Structures are given as C-alpha cells and as structure tokens.
Amino acid sequence: GISQTPLGAVTGEENADGDDQKALDVLADQLIEQALAKTSLFAYLSEEREQPVPLSASGQLICACDPLDGSSNIDTNLTIGTIFSLYPAPDHKTETNLLCPGRDQIAAGFFAYGPQTALLLTYGNGVFAFCFDGAQYRLMDWQVRIPGQTSEFAINAANHRHWSARTTSYIDQLLAGKQGERGRNFNMRWAGSLVADCWRILRRGGIFLYPEDSRRGFESGRLRLVYEANPISFLVEQAGGLATDGERDILDIQPTELHQRVPLIFGSANEVEFYKSD
C-alpha cells in the first residue's frame, strides 16, 4: 500500500507529459484506475497516461484526473493532492469527442493530503469542503467564497527573467507595495503544489499565476488544461473567483489534445481582472 511505498523515489520513467514519475505517482494512478473500474464510468483520462483508459462501454460519465498533484513535494512532506472532474460521455464515443471544454464539467474537486486530509467539491452549485476524520468525510462548517480583494499573490519568482512584459509589469507593481502605484503592500506565497495554493486562495483570497514564459516548452503555459486547469477553474468560479489564461476564461477553452497545456491565472476576481487589464 501507499504507507509502504518509497514515497519520493523516482521510477526512472516519464509520464505522458515528459515529467519524471515518482513511485507514488504510479501507485496513485493505479489505485484510481482500480477504483474507477468498479464503477459505470465510460473512461478514465489520466495525466499519467498517453491515452484514455476505457472502462464501461455503456458508461455515461468520463473522469479526468491528475492522480497526484505536487509530487515534487513528496520527499519534503508538504501538501500534495488528487485533482479530478467529471464530464458527460458523448453519444459518439471517440477520443476526439472526449475533449470537452471545462464548461461541460458536471462536477470537479480535489483531495488535499496535508496536515488534514480534505476534499473540496463542486457540482456547479457552490463549493463544499469536507474533512476526513479517519472513517468518513464530514462536511466542514465553511462557506467557501473567495474574497474579491486580496493582498497575497502566488508565483514562482525564480522565473522572473523568462516572463512576458505584462507579467513582469504586474508583479513589479505588487512588489513596489505602498511606495508603488497600487498603494498597498502585498505578500508572496508559493507552495509549489497547485492544490495547496488553491486551498489557501479559497480560504483567504489571493491570486495564483503560472503564466506562459520564454523557456522552451513553456511558451503555451505549463499546467494541463484537462487535468488541472479545468477542475481548479470550475471550483474557483463556483467560489466567486475568476480563472483565465490571460485572455480567455479557462472554462471556455476548447481542448485540442488530451495533454494540452495552458497558462493559468486564478483567484480573487478584482485582482484577476486587474492582471488581465494591465
């Protein structure tokens, strides 16, 4: 089981996106496939797999999943998670037809494995938070709404030299604080785990930026539209925030391939709008 796995060990293999796989990445993917095989889902789309995994030919739903987000944090014992979403299966089931815009999602969420094991979930009618008590998931007393205003931002500042002029200008304004044109101080938070950064923003507001940049392989962003950006954006919008690639709402983008990458900026609505207008 997971508790016996060399958690941070690298397998020597790469996943469908060319990222190094860790032992727990592979195990998480296998466990999820085994669990979904017992359901009536039509197909399993995994960030770890090149192709869809067929399940039940009569199934009416598709599950898209990042089995283990933030796996670079495994050996440092920081928060990691599982991101997922559900789509209706198309009438004529081909691989091309499995590519649906995020607006078609009927449910999405993520599990966070940190100081507490928790679940954030939306069915398109708000966001609900659950905490695992060792036996079952219990609904938390938390009205999940992202504050419209924020004084926190999340970005990997080590990539500053690769950013576009717009991203550089925006972050420089935040760093200027009270002495700058924004007239107030901002704090930077960066967990290196999408689920951890998203949880924090859902809790207390903020803006998350993983923009495109000039590095090879990053020109169109780095996060996966189907497995990461769409489910996170569905949660964010349902909590009153916004999610964009800088030009379009993430949920309006029509995927052209399973492992398509996009820039992702999400969080407090006012701050996301400010970034888009800069």
List where the protein language model places each region:
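IMPase-like, lithium-sensitive Mg2+-dependent phosphomonoesterase catalytic core
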Residues: 2-4, 13-15, 23-278
